[in-house]
Amino acid sequence: MPQALLDAHSVSIGDGAIALHGETGIPLRSLGTGSSRLLVAGLQRAAAGSAPIALVDEVEYGLEPHRLMRFLDSLGAKEVAAPPLQVFLTTHSPVALRELSGGQLFVVRPTGGHHVVKPAGTSNEVQSTLRADPEAFLAKSAIVCEGASEVGFARGLDQAWVQAGQRSFLALGGSYVNAGGGSPDNSFARGAALLNLGYRVLVFIDADKPSAPGVAEAFVAAGGQVLTWRHGLTLEDEMFRHLPDASLDSLLAKAEE
């Protein structure tokens, strides 16, 4: 019985027709952007002995958050003691920043016609901000809030201003940092860490507990700003003193939900 087969002598196959295939039979050149980047990261790590330096621009490009984390792991982001590669990468992704330590992060600033590279450092203030609020390192300005209540209050004001036709604080390159409550010194320490890296910083705290002597003054002298209430009062005190009864009833009803 005759069969329809290719004539090997009449078919021209060039170099471009030969490609590596994966386990599922898909040509590797047909992989998506994210899969291709993961493959390249693995190859780069395997060749680290002869090519120990890697350059990655916009590391988050084409990668979902979970794959971005895997990509950074492949490049040795968690192997701080003995990294397999020396990697220079740029990013605008808070997911990528959260996976790094402060010792791996450098902030680049244009200054007087040239650029200054500042190491973020490994202080507790830098590391805790990286884990909880990495967006702060991608912003121009940061409001360091004493706790979650202050963050919510600031966000609410921002939304009200947007509804009134003003530009959003976030659209202007701003971010919020939650200092986690406690002493106001915590907020000043977080703020000072960002201030030293060239960010514009405002600390938003209650006025019921004083900071350590000289802490607030040193922060302001370094270029920081402080927003607080009248002496001895907190956010909750001011709200219950000045909001109308209807608004207070709404707040209490929300708290009971």
Segments predicted by a language model, with ranges:
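Charged, alpha-helix-enriched surfaces in structured cytosolic catalytic cores
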Residues: 66, 70, 91, 148, ...
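Coupling/switch/interface segments within P-loop NTPase motor domains and analogous charged loops
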Residues: 1-5
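Activity-critical C-terminal alpha-helical subdomain
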Residues: 206-257
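Switch/communication elements of ASCE P-loop NTPase nucleotide-binding domains
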Residues: 14-136
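A short acidic, amphipathic alpha-helical/loop segment
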Residues: 70, 189-193, 214-218
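RecA-like P-loop NTPase motor core
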Residues: 76-83, 94-202, 207-211, 224
